A protein has these predicted regions:
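A conserved structural motif in NAD(P)-dependent oxidoreductases
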Residues: 77-81, 158
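Glycine/proline-rich active-site loop of Rossmann-fold NAD(P)-dependent oxidoreductases
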Residues: 13, 38-53, 62, 67, ...
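C-terminal "lid/loop" region of Rossmann-like NAD(P)-dependent oxidoreductases
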Residues: 69-71, 97-100, 108-115, 122-139, ...
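Non-catalytic, hydrophobic alpha-helical segments
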Residues: 82, 102, 113, 147, ...
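Hydrophobic "lid"/C-terminal helical patch
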Residues: 86-90, 114-117, 163-170
Length: 181
């Protein structure tokens, strides 16, 4: 079925096809990695992703918006884990092109993520629920079996530790922004 997200999904599929065609025609070394929900320092505070949105809202004691009931799950991968996986993928034999999934298979309900961030920031934010868009997936969890087999890779940074680092980074961003004003 063609839904609101179809262009996003098809764009990624099309890009993989173009890379493989270019690889076959020009004998160029290609590696295809499918990246799942990555977060970490140096993210733009206003990039619109759930982790950065929740942290900024919590640090500013603003309401945290959850679409749906918050039971939908997401898997969050810390940037250091992604980089390690990418380096390992680049170092595989030329014949192995992928695709390979790099992500954290541990799922967290969106509501639990919001509650955890509020707790970790000491925020007075309240959680506000809004209607869930029709195209929003109820679950996103990567299968990293191939990454484990081919790369000897799996994520090592736990969500709690990654959030701690992100919160500290965003606190510094907010301090810098308010000092510059």
């Amino acid at each position: 079925a063609v839904g609101y997200r179809s262009c996003y999904d098809e764009g990624k599929r099309c890009a993989e096809t173009l890379f493989m065609d270019y690889h076959r025609q020009n004998n160029v070394r290609v590696k295809i990695i499918r990246i799942f929900n990555t977060y970490g320092p140096r993210m733009l505070p206003n990039d619109g992703r759930v982790v950065s949105n929740f942290i900024l809202q919590a640090l500013n004691n603003e309401d945290i918006t959850i679409y749906g009931d918050g039971k939908q799950t997401r898997s969050f991968q810390y940037i250091d884990d992604l980089i390690e996986g990418m380096i390992r993928m680049m170092n595989t034999e030329d014949e192995f092109t992928g695709p390979i999934n790099l992500g954290n298979p541990n799922e967290f309900p969106v509501l639990e993520l919001a509650e955890r961030i509020i707790s970790m920031t000491g925020s007075s934010s309240k959680i506000v629920f809004k209607s869930l868009p029709d195209d929003d997936p109820k679950q996103r969890q990567p299968d990293i079996t191939l990454a484990k087999e081919k790369l000897g890779w799996q994520p090592t940074v736990e969500l709690e530790e990654g959030l701690k680092r992100m919160i500290e980074y965003f606190k510094n961003c907010l301090l810098y922004t308010s000092d510059a004003a």
